[in-house]
Amino acid sequence: MAREKIVVAGGTTKSWKLLLGLRIFAFMATLAAAIVMSLNKETKTLVVATIGTVPIKATLTAKFQHTPAFVFFVIANVMVSFHNLLMIVVQIFSRKLEYKGLRLLSIAILDMLNATLVSAAANAAVFVAELGKNGNKHAKWNKVCDRFTTYCDHGAGAIIAAFAGVILMLLVSAVSISRLLINSKNFSTTATTTSVV
């Protein structure tokens, strides 16, 4: 007796569960990256100069809003989180709907765009984080991570979560594309069968 695959919404039940699990993990990773980076702030009082023996101190604050790349990072991760949340809700509550043609294609394209978006944001944040950690001797930019260690550590955690989100979104895109291909093969097989009869 041959075991039949149950086809659900453009693929098998196994691919449906895999896609749902990947989306949930991608949602959690990108949301964690956005939250950690958006709450990233550290205030320090530093000696900026000395006059004679009297130190002159200044209180400085490092915030993610001070760097446009980190602002882009937060916005992009929030957008990808929202996309995944919306797709999770649609996937759970419309399980019995038929996903054909344009719907599957648009979902696959949106998944690829979101994978690209979170990848660009993570790479922009890595560039700025590297400048913060090592500075740039040629441009005479000083490093800041030797003074704002907590800020840099939280930023590194957010970047790691974002790269986990990138990997998960690439897997989501691969599964979405495979579901699209499976659906197009099923459609072409059905169309060939009906035209032969």
UniProtKB/Swiss-Prot annotation:
Keywords: Acetylation, Cell membrane, Membrane, Transmembrane, Transmembrane helix. PANTHER family: CASP-LIKE PROTEIN 1U1. It is a multi-pass membrane protein. InterPro entries: CASP/CASPL, CASP_dom, CASPL. It holds the Pfam family CASP_dom. The keyword Acetylation applies. Belongs to the Casparian strip membrane proteins (CASP) family. It is found in: Cell membrane. The modification N-acetylalanine is found at A2. Its main location: membrane. The chain crosses the membrane at residues 18-38, 70-90, 107-127, 157-177. Homodimer and heterodimers. It comes from the Eukaryota. This is CASP-like protein 1B2. The keyword Cell membrane applies. It comes from Arabidopsis thaliana.
